[in-house]
C-alpha cells in the first residue's frame, strides 16, 4: 500500500508495523502485538521509521528482524507507553537498496520466540547495474558484441549505448546486447540505464586492438647436466592476446649448427631441453606466439653441458701396514679407456657403521692416519671428475685382529648396534613424554581450567539514536516520588538533589540482564538541550519491596559522594511510575562505559572470536587505575567488599573505574565492619578474616585487589579453578595461595603475595600498591606506549554527537566491530559462585577495633611457604 508523506514531517516516512497475530498463533496469555501487515515503497535516500507495538508484557526484550537476521542498526528506541505496553522504533535515516526486505518484531516469552507478521519494505531508485561493459581486445575489423543490464525497482529499465562521445543504436529494454561490426583502433564504450526515477551511467570499457607479441625477456639457462638443461624466460608484451606457445631453437657453438627446435606450451614460461651432448657448448633463443602471429627471436644465450660422470671403478684394492698409518693402493683407470677427464679418486672409510672420513687423491695411493686399529675398518674408492663420483668399488674389510699383518675381503656384515640404540632412544622418549603429561594432568586436576570455552554469540554492542523524548505519564499513573517508595528520610535527603524525572531520558536496548535486574542504554537530555549517552540500571518489576528499593538506592547514595577519575560517578536516580498503586521501579543512571566490564574485556582478548594482544604495560595500567580508585575510596573510609575485575568498568579511553558498590559500607568509627546475615558474598575474592569472622576492612579490600591483579595477568581466568567454595577457607588456612601465572613478572607476583598476607595489618596499602606498580611499569617504558598494539584501531567513531551515537569496538577493520562486541557480551556470564555468610550477626557498625582474641586468632593464621610445583606465596 502507498505511504503518504506527512505535512509535519516532509522528509520522515513513518511506517506503522502493527502485527495482529504471531506466525504460529501461539500467543502467550495476555500478550499480543497490535496492528496489521503492510507493504511500503520508498525512494532511495529517504528516511524511514518502523514501529511495532506490544501489549501484555512488562520490560520485554524486543528485537528487530530483517529476512531472518537480527537488525544491528544503531537507531533503535524502545518506549514504554505504560507498564505492560511497549513501542519499539527502528529508524533508517537514508535507505539503500540493501535495506529492502521483510521486517518484523520478535520477543522471547517463556523460552519461546514470538514474532509479529511481516512488513515488506521496497526501496525504489535509479537503475542499478548488474552487468556493465567490460574491457576486451579484438582483432582489427573483426565483429564483437558488448553487454549491459540494469534493474529497478521501479521497472522497466531502458538501456542507451554510447561509443566514444556518440550514441549508438536505439534505446533497448534491459538487458541489452550491442553488436559492433568491427574497429581498427582503440575505442571506449559505455551504457546508460533509465527509469522513471532517473538514469545511471555504467563504467567506461576500453576495446583494444590485438597485435603480434614482442620478444621474451631475461632468457636464462639453469640446472645444466651432461645431457639436459632448463631454459626459463619472462614473456614480453602479449599483443593484447593470450600467448599459446613459445619456440626454442638450440644450436651448437661456435658454428651455430641447429640441433633442435622445441615448441613449448605456455604458461609456464620454462622448458627442459634434453638429449644434449656432454662437454659441449650450446646456444638457445626463444620466440612466443599468439593468435595474431609470432614475435621475433631473442638474442642467443650460451651455455655448456657438463662432463659424463665416470663409469669405471677402481680394482684390486689392497692395504699395507705402516707406522703410524696405512697405505692404501689400487689399480688406476687407463686414460685410453675413459674420456671423462679423470681428476682423481675419492676414498671413504667406515668404522662402527659410520663414515669416519674421506679424502681425495690424485694418484692410486692414499695414506690413512685417522682410524682406530682396534676396530674393523671398511674402505671403498671411486673415480672422480668434474661431473662427480663414479660407482664405488667393492667394499674392502680389514678386521681388527688382522691389523698387524694379514688382510682379507669378506662380505659387508650387518651390525645390530644402531637398531638397539634406536629402540633405547624411543623408550626413553616415550617415558619422558608420559611423565610430562602425568605432571600436567595432576596440575589440571588440582587447580582446574579457568574456562572450557567461551563462544561469542556475535551479539553486537547496543546502539541507538533517540529521535525524541516521550512523556509516559497518564491519568492512571501515580506520580513517582521519593516519598512514594517508602525509603528512610536519611536516604531521601541524600538522593533529593540527584533525582531525575523519567521524561528527561529515553531508554534504548538492553545491555544486560541478571537475576535481580537489568541495564539498558539510554539518552539523557541535559539542561542545555544536548544529549548524553548513559547506562540505566534498574530492578526487575516483579521481585522488589520497599526494602529492595532502599538497598538498591543506597548504592546510588554511596556513589553520590565519589569524585575520582577511577571511581564510577553517579549521574542521578529516577523512578518509573506504575499503575494500580504499585511501587515505582527505581533506576540508577551511570556513565556509559564503551568497553563494558574489565573481566569480559579480558576474556574477549584471550578466547573471543577475534582474540587480540594485551601487552603487559596495558595490564599494569589497569592495575594502577584500580589501585588509584581504591586508594581514593579508602581515604573516604569506604570499604568495597566486592572488588573484582567484573566490577571494574572500561571506558573508551581504556581507563578503568571501580564500580558496583552494592556491598560497600562507610566506616564512621574504627577500622572494620562486621557483616550481618543473609548477604551473598564472592567467596573466592574474600580475605581469610572475612571468611572466618565476617570482618571487612580496607585490608580485606587489598586481599581482593591481589585476586583482581591475578585475574588481569591471566586475562580473565577463574581464581582457584577446581576448588569448591566450601573448600576455599581450608585451602587458604593451609598456606596455599593462587599460583604465579606463566607470564607474570616476579615483582608483580610478589605484590600479589603481600596482598594475601594472613595478618591484615601487614598487607600494603593501596597507595603503596599504586606506587609500586607505577615503578614496575616505569621500568618497562622503553617501549613507547604509542606502539602498544592494544591501541590499534580502537573506537573508530566517525561521529560522536547525539545525531549518530554509534559505538564501535574494533580491533581490526570495521567489519569486525560487531563480532568483537558480541564476543565481549557473550563473555559477561558472572561465572563466579556465591555462598551465604557463615555467621548471622546484626548488620550494624561497631565502633571498636579488633578485640585481642581476634588479633590472636589472626596471628594464628601464619603459615610456612610452600615451595613445591609452581611458585606460590
Swiss-Prot record:
Residues 29-416 are extracellular. Disulfide bonds join 52-105, 148-191. It comes from the Eukaryota. It is found in: Cell membrane. Residues 1-28 form the signal peptide. This is Tyrosine-protein kinase receptor TYRO3. Residues 847-858 have a biased composition (Basic and acidic residues). The active site is at residue 642. Residues 215-308, 310-403 form the Fibronectin type-III domain.
Amino acid at each position: 500500500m502507498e505511504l503518504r508523506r506527512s505535512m509535519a514531517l516532509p522528509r520522515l516516512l513513518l511506517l506503522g508495523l502493527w502485527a495482529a497475530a504471531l506466525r504460529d498463533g501461539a500467543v502467550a496469555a495476555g500478550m499480543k502485538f497490535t496492528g496489521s501487515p503492510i507493504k511500503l515503497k520508498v525512494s532511495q535516500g529517504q528516511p524511514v521509521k518502523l514501529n511495532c507495538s506490544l501489549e501484555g508484557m512488562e520490560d520485554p526484550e524486543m528485537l528487530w528482524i530483517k529476512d531472518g537476521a537480527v537488525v544491528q542498526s544503531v537507531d533503535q528506541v524502545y518506549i514504554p507507553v505504560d507498564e505492560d505496553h511497549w513501542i519499539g522504533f527502528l529508524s533508517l535515516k537514508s535507505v539503500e537498496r540493501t535495506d529492502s526486505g521483510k521486517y518484523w518484531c520478535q520477543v522471547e516469552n517463556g523460552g519461546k520466540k514470538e514474532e509479529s507478521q511481516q512488513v515488506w519494505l521496497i526501496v525504489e531508485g535509479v537503475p542499478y547495474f548488474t552487468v556493465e561493459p567490460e574491457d576486451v581486445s579484438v582483432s582489427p575489423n573483426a565483429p564483437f558484441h558488448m553487454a549491459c543490464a540494469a534493474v529497478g525497482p521501479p521497472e522497466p529499465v531502458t538501456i542507451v549505448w554510447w561509443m566514444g562521445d556518440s550514441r549508438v543504436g536505439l534505446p533497448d529494454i534491459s538487458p541489452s546486447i550491442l553488436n559492433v561490426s568491427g574497429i581498427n583502433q582503440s575505442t571506449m564504450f559505455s551504457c546508460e540505464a533509465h527509469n522513471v526515477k532517473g538514469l545511471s551511467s555504467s563504467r567506461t570499457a576500453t576495446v583494444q586492438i590485438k597485435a603480434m607479441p614482442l620478444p621474451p625477456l631475461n632468457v636464462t639457462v639453469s640446472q645444466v647436466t651432461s645431457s639436459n638443461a632448463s631454459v626459463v624466460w619472462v614473456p614480453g608484451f602479449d599483443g593484447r592476446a593470450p600467448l599459446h606457445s613459445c619456440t626454442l631453437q638450440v644450436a651448437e657453438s661456435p658454428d651455430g649448427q641447429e640441433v633442435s627446435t622445441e615448441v613449448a606450451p605456455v604458461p609456464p614460461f620454462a622448458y627442459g631441453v634434453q638429449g644434449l651432448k656432454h662437454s659441449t657448448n650450446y646456444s638457445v633463443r626463444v620466440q612466443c606466439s599468439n593468435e595474431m602471429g609470432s614475435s621475433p627471436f631473442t638474442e642467443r644465450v650460451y651455455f655448456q653441458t657438463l662432463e659424463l660422470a665416470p663409469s669405471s671403478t677402481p680394482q684390486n684394492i689392497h692395504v699395507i701396514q705402516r707406522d703410524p698409518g696405512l697405505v692404501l693402493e689400487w689399480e688406476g683407470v687407463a686414460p685410453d679407456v675413459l674420456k671423462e677427464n679423470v681428476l682423481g679418486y675419492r676414498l671413504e672409510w667406515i668404522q662402527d657403521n659410520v663414515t669416519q672420513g674421506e679424502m681425495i687423491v690424485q694418484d692410486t695411493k692414499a695414506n690413512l692416519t685417522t682410524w682406530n686399529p682396534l676396530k674393523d675398518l671398511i674402505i671403498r674408492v671411486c673415480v672422480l671428475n668434474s661431473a662427480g663420483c663414479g660407482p664405488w668399488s667393492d667394499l674392502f674389510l680389514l678386521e681388527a685382529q688382522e691389523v698387524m699383518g694379514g688382510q682379507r675381503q669378506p662380505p659387508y656384515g650387518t651390525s645390530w648396534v644402531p637398531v638397539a640404540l634406536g629402540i633405547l632412544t624411543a623408550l626413553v622418549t616415550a617415558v619422558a613424554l608420559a611423565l610430562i603429561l602425568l605432571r600436567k594432568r595432576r596440575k589440571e586436576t588440582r587447580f582446574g581450567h579457568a574456562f572450557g570455552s567461551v563462544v561469542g554469540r556475535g551479539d553486537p554492542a547496543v546502539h541507538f539514536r533517540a529521535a525524541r523524548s516521550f512523556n509516559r505519564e497518564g491519568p492512571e499513573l501515580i506520580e513517582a516520588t521519593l516519598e512514594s517508595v517508602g525509603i528512610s528520610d536519611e536516604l531521601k535527603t541524600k538522593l533529593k538533589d540527584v533525582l531525575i524525572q523519567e521524561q528527561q531520558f529515553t531508554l534504548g536496548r538492553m545491555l544486560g540482564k541478571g537475576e535481580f535486574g537489568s541495564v539498558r542504554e539510554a539518552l539523557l537530555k541535559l539542561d542545555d538541550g544536548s544529549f548524553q549517552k548513559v547506562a540505566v540500571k534498574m530492578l526487575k518489576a516483579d521481585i522488589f519491596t520497599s526494602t529492595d528499593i532502599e538497598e538498591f538506592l543506597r548504592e546510588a547514595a554511596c556513589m553520590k559522594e565519589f569524585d575520582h577519575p577511577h571511581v564510577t560517578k553517579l549521574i542521578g536516580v529516577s523512578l518509573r511510575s506504575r499503575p494500580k498503586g504499585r511501587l515505582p521501579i527505581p533506576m540508577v543512571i551511570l556513565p556509559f562505559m564503551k568497553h563494558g566490564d574489565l573481566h569480559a574485556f579480558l576474556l574477549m582478548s584471550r578466547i573471543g572470536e577475534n582474540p587480540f594482544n594485551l601487552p603487559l604495560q596495558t595490564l599494569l595500567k589497569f592495575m594502577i587505575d584500580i589501585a588509584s580508585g581504591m586508594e581514593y575510596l579508602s581515604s573516604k573510609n569506604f570499604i568495597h567488599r566486592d572488588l573484582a575485575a567484573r566490577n571494574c568498568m572500561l571506558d573508551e579511553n581504556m581507563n578503568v573505574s571501580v564500580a558496583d558498590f552494592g556491598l560497600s559500607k562507610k566506616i564512621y568509627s574504627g577500622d572494620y565492619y562486621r557483616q550481618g546475615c543473609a548477604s551473598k558474598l564472592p567467596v573466592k575474592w574474600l580475605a581469610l578474616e572475612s571468611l572466618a569472622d565476617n570482618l571487612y576492612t580496607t585490608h580485606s579490600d587489598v586481599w581482593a585487589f591481589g585476586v583482581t591483579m591475578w585475574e588481569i595477568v591471566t586475562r580473565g581466568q577463574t581464581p582457584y579453578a577446581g576448588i569448591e567454595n566450601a573448600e576455599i577457607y581450608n585451602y587458604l588456612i593451609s598456606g596455599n595461595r593462587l599460583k604465579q601465572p606463566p607470564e607474570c613478572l616476579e615483582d608483580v607476583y610478589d605484590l600479589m603475595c603481600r596482598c594475601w598476607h594472613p595478618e591484615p595489618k601487614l598487607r600494603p596499602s593501596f597507595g603503596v600498591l599504586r606506587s609500586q606498580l607505577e615503578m614496575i611499569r616505569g621500568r618497562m617504558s622503553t617501549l613507547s606506549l604509542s606502539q602498544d598494539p592494544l591501541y590499534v584501531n580502537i573506537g573508530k567513531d566517525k561521529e560522536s554527537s547525539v545525531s549518530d551515537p554509534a559505538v564501535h569496538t574494533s580491533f581490526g577493520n570495521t567489519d569486525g566491530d560487531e563480532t568483537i562486541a558480541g564476543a565481549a557480551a557473550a563473555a559477561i556470564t558472572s561465572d563466579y559462585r556465591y555462598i551465604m555468610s557463615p555467621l548471622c550477626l546484626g548488620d550494624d557498625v561497631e565502633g571498636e577495633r579488633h578485640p585481642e582474641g581476634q588479633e590472636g586468632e589472626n596471628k594464628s593464621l601464619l603459615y610456612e611457604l610452600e615451595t613445591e610445583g609452581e611458585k606460590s606465596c
